[in-house]
From Swiss-Prot:
Domain of life per record: Bacteria
Descriptive protein name: DNA mismatch repair protein MutS
Record carries keyword Secreted: no
Family stated for the protein in its record: Belongs to the DNA mismatch repair MutS family.
Keyword Nucleotide-binding: yes
CDD domains documented for this protein: ABC_MutS1
Gene this protein is translated from: mutS
InterPro entries per the UniProt record, alphabetical: DNA_mismatch_repair_MutS (IPR005748), DNA_mismatch_repair_MutS-lik_N (IPR007695), DNA_mismatch_repair_MutS/MSH (IPR017261), DNA_mismatch_repair_MutS_C (IPR000432), DNA_mismatch_repair_MutS_clamp (IPR007861), DNA_mismatch_repair_MutS_core (IPR007696), DNA_mismatch_repair_MutS_N (IPR016151), DNA_mismatch_repair_MutS_sf (IPR036187)
GO biological process: mismatch repair
Annotated NCBIfam families: mutS1, PRK05399.1
Pfam families: MutS_I (PF01624), MutS_II (PF05188), MutS_III (PF05192), MutS_IV (PF05190), MutS_V (PF00488)
Residues that, per the record, bind ATP: 616-623
Length: 861
């Protein structure tokens, strides 16, 4: 903190800088000085380290040298992009005063703040990925979460029921910035997020949030958006909107509504499931060999982003899914893929261009790309109208007629404008008569100067005479030193060079003033006309946004049709029974990376067969089989066709996976602890409509502990939850479960062993695996034969000396299951036991005793 005394010791310019810096102490300040952005003090040191730019010193202020770093204004976007990628925020300070009239430092002010979550510049954004900012609020054990996509205006809120649901939502949306209240006390749920920003409690005040939101949407209340009964979500949304306004320093007209995300509307995927299924990110953190990498061949960036949102948020509305399916079928039946995609490709990223139009930050080439996008709509509409597919026709009903706006941009802009309006040459000839006049005057200078040069050369007889221009001295007549003595008396010397003299004459000076005025006037008028284009487009922003959303959806549907045709996918059907029946299903990703043909496999889960115990060798394909079942189910619930011969799928509310685990070193949790935490979440959250994948539960502890836990988990899922479950295990003892419990069946993935080698068949068969292939897999992995031989000897010895054979262990578990059936009844009898213990028969009348007996009978069903 700089004291008043120290502040006064600084130069006026540095005082101005320090005042602006004090407004934004926690972020970098880019301070405009002429053609450069400069950073000072700690900002300079930090920027020099992050951007690999030179750290210098700028004289002294208050008796101390000033650390300084900077970059040219025309190169700032590249530096901003790097800083944003590193999670930094930057305040942009511009000169708004006129240097020629300013007394003291030129007036400056912060015009915008660039943060990772509020950027809209094309160069700063990942093209095919949403760039979201979120805010989270907490009251007791409940949460409110709001998200905003500044590049589209999409504004949503939800109220996660608990911290696990909050963690899953944050994993889904992956915000690049997260605002949280200073009183937030569940940091473990958000500590994995990028760009954490602590905000004061008053920014989450509910009444302020409602007022702010109503003012933004021009409404009296929020009932039309269906969010009025979500106070925690609204508190988060209010903070988020206020932050967006603070950083942008302008109106946000593209944020026109807010919607509520209802958990019951979507299939819930927890963080572990998203990770294990490798939807958009693989286990190594990359994007290769993910579901999105196979499925996403969209021709527009906005379509690609929409598809990823569908993948991460499968919907349960079967009617909506059937509409998507029928649209895909129409595209295939009418052979529309090749017809529609070339036009869609030219639509480009209309969604983000419109956001920049709303923020009035769109550059000339943004507007020409918008023009190109609007030019494609009639052609796309004509193709659809010619074939009249009902679902696609309904989709096109959301796209208005933009011929007027398209004509405006065609008349106003040249074909290929320069990057920035400051360079001029953006507005087309014929659009504005006054601009054409100014341009004619300035553009006519070349011919006039050629004529003047010819005339002066002839009148003076000086053959080296020529007319030129530079930014410092303006127009001049140049004569070589050898002929300078011939210069007429009315030539006024302007500059002496080593080999020439430069002069000015009244006529040339007068023309210079006229030309410079015309160029300045033309540029000023061009900027004014450019700004007026925003005024003419903004009244149509809402309908343009609806059109961009419809075109995004069309791109996704055409893409899914192309994928279905290319990859041999089929349309799944939906049914009312909780079930999954897939004939010859394939893993959508693995089949694309395998050199050999993929072995397709069936799966059938229903009320009478709701848990499959899967055995077989490691590397035999158990994990692939389970994942493909989940991915096929997920694909069905985004409306896509699926990799199978047929698929019939019933209602699913959640997908859980407990597949693979490793130590969580950062949190100090072992593999076993990670495994048990994920398993506990499944046992608490799963329902009879959940699809549950369990792979090798019980590792990382003693054999008997692991076996007991695996058996108990399988039994609980089968008896108490009755979810649709695939339960892969290396405990052969669990294959006895079907004999003990209804609804459980054994399946296995087979392998063939011959002469110490093993061949994996990858084909699912009914029944349990005949044996374990652990030693054969170890040999395949390259374990020395001497070690394998020793292991076989030890295995024989252990089996011989074991106090329990495998059959005896299974029998013991059967008896334990029979004798301890009450364990699963304990929770239900706790209340009954407590009621009886509190009962005092001597205090009851006969009528009260009879009533109490009926109550106890009701408790036991």
């Amino acid at each position: 903190m700089i004291s008043e005394e120290n502040f006064q010791q600084h130069t006026p310019m540095m005082q101005q800088y320090l005042k602006l810096k004090a407004e934004n102490p926690d972020i970098l300040l880019f301070y405009r000085m002429g053609d450069f952005y400069e950073l000072f003090y700690d900002d300079a040191k930090k920027a020099a380290a992050l951007l690999d730019i030179s750290l210098t010193k700028r004289g002294q202020s208050a008796g101390q040298p000033i650390p300084m770093a900077g970059m040219p204004y025309h190169a700032v976007e590249g530096y901003l992009a790097k800083l944003v990628q590193l999670g930094e925020s930057v305040a942009i300070c511009e000169q708004i005063g006129d240097p020629t009239t300013s007394k003291g430092p030129v007036e400056r002010q912060i015009v915008r703040i660039v943060t990772p979550g509020t950027v809209s510049d094309e160069a700063l954004l990942p093209e095919r990925q949403d760039n979201l900012i979120a805010a989270v609020y907490q009251e007791k054990e409940k949460f409110g979460l709001a998200t905003l996509d500044m590049t589209s205006g999409r504004f949503q809120l939800c109220e996660p029921a608990d911290k696990e649901t909050l963690r899953a939502e944050l994993q889904r949306i992956a915000p690049v910035e997260l605002l949280y209240c200073e009183e937030f006390n569940e940091m473990a749920a958000i500590e994995h997020c990028k760009g954490l920003r602590r905000r004061p409690i008053w920014e989450f005040e509910l009444s302020t949030a409602i007022t702010l939101l109503n003012r933004q949407f021009g409404t009296k209340d929020l009932r039309a958006f269906g969010v009025e009964k979500s106070p925690l979500g609204l508190s988060a949304a209010g903070c988020l909107l206020q932050y967006a306004k603070e950083t942008q320093r302008t109106a946000l007209p593209h944020i026109q509504s807010i919607s509520l995300i209802q958990n019951q509307d979507c299939i819930q995927l927890d963080a572990a499931t998203r990770r294990n299924l490798e939807l958009t990110q693989n286990l190594a953190g990359g994007t290769e060999n993910t579901l999105a990498s196979v499925l996403d061949k969209c021709v527009t960036p906005m379509g690609s982003r929409l598809l990823k949102r569908w993948i991460h948020q499968p919907v349960r509305d079967v009617e909506k899914l059937k509409q998507r399916q029928q649209s895909i079928a129409e595209i295939l039946n009418f052979d529309l893929v090749d017809e529609l995609q070339p036009y869609l490709q030219l639509v480009g990223d209309m969604e983000r261009i419109l956001a920049r139009v709303a923020l009035r930050s769109a550059r000339p080439r943004d507007l020409t790309r918008l023009r190109t996008a609007l030019e494609q709509i009639p052609a796309l509409r004509a193709i659809v109208q010619q074939k009249t597919p009902p679902f696609l026709t309904a989709l096109f009903s959301q796209i208005a007629d933009f011929s007027e706006q398209c004509d405006l941009l065609q008349r106003a802009l040249i074909e290929t404008p320069p990057l920035l309006i400051r360079d001029g040459g953006v507005i087309a000839e014929g659009y504005n008569a006054e601009l054409d006049e100014w341009r004619m005057l300035s553009d006519g200078a070349t011919q006039y100067l050629e004529n003047l040069e010819k005339r002066e050369r002839e009148s003076t007889g000086i053959d080296t005479l020529k007319i030129g221009f530079n930014a410092v001295h303006g127009y001049y007549i140049q004569i070589s030193q050898g002929q300078a003595h011939k210069a007429p008396i009315h030539y006024v010397r302007r500059q002496t060079l080593k080999n020439a003299e430069r002069y000015i004459i009244p006529e040339l000076k007068e023309y210079e003033d006229k030309v410079l005025k015309s160029k300045g006037a033309a540029l000023a008028l061009e900027k004014q006309l450019y700004d007026e284009l925003f005024d003419l487009l903004l009244p149509h922003l809402g309908s343009l946004q609806l059109a961009s959303l419809a075109l995004s959806e069309l791109d996704v549907l055409v893409n899914l049709a192309e994928r279905a045709d290319t990859l041999n996918y089929v349309m799944p059907t939906f049914c009312d029974e909780v079930s999954v029946k897939i004939k010859n299903g394939r893993h959508p990703v693995v089949e694309q990376v395998l050199k050999d043909p993929f072995i397709a496999n069936p799966v059938e889960l229903n009320h009478n067969r709701h848990l499959l115990v899967i055995t077989g060798p490691n590397m035999g394909g158990k994990s692939t089989y389970m994942r493909q079942t989940a991915l096929i189910t997920l694909l069905a619930y985004i409306g896509s066709f699926v990799p199978a011969d047929s698929a019939r799928i019933g209602p699913i509310d959640r997908i859980f996976t407990r597949i693979g685990a490793s130590d969580d070193l950062a949190s100090g949790r072992s593999t076993f602890m990670v495994e048990m935490t994920e398993m506990a979440n499944i046992l608490h959250q799963a329902t009879a409509q959940s699809l549950v994948l369990i792979d090798e539960i019980g590792r990382g502890t003693s054999t008997y502990d692991g076996l007991s836990l695996a058996w108990a988990c399988a039994e609980w899922l089968s008896k108490k939850i009755r979810s649709l479950t695939l339960f892969a295990t290396h405990y052969f003892e669990l294959t006895a479960l079907p004999e003990q419990l209804e609804g459980i069946a054994n399946i296995h993935l087979d392998a063939l062993e011959h002469n110490n080698t093993i061949a994996f068949m990858h084909a699912v068969q009914n029944g349990a695996a005949s044996k374990s292939y652990g030693l054969a897999v170890a040999a395949l992995a390259g374990v020395p034969q001497s070690v394998i031989k020793l292991a076989k000897q030890k295995l024989t010895q252990l089996e011989k000396n074991s106090s329990y054979s495998a059959e005896q262990q299974i029998q013991a578990l059967r008896e334990a299951n029979h004798n301890q059936g009450e364990l699963f009844f304990e929770q239900e009898t706790d209340a009954l036991r407590e009621a009886i213990e509190k009962l005092d028969p001597d205090d009851l009348s006969p009528k009260q005793a009879l009533a109490y007996l009926y109550q106890l009978k009701k408790m036991v069903g």
